[in-house]
């Protein structure tokens, strides 16, 4: 499964809010074997959101959209997703019932809360509603597009409710080495060409090591590539910061 992430919000583009949703979702999807191919942040502009959703829905197996749900003027995501699929917004009975239950439960704490329930409970026609157990605004699933709130706690709770719908065949292995990145280039090219796996090197200067991540849809090739690197690269244990392997050709006899 291939996926794209679309995060919505002027505050993200301005740097006022850290885009933790993209990082969290990318990690969760990758752990499920999903290949995240694109991460895009768009402003609170209906046309920009609709264009991104339309393009990615055609190109990828799944699209996850976060942010822009609610009752404020800049909350345009549901309108944009509906437009991307040439649908209207319709009040959803399940979403309305959940909103009414939630509002009843919090009315004593927020007596002046004024919510347009019909607008809040409206999702693209024919969409599947996603109930918000941690907040107000419902999400929705429209064909292969999943729409979640932008508040991290609400987004994570909603994602967990549909997490089983995301599954892929991409597996990964991670190794750590104290060797300089520049010294690894030839061996990383070799393992990529020999075994047909994807490999990346990610420096962690604070820890004093490099993280090597191998990815493939073929578990056998991945195991072979990992075993080859274990023989060719000096590895370390990132927790103990001790060497766990020797590079071929090194003489440790004293």
Where are these regions (language model features)?
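Glycine-rich phosphate/diphosphate-binding loop of Rossmann-like nucleotide-binding domains
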Residues: 1-44
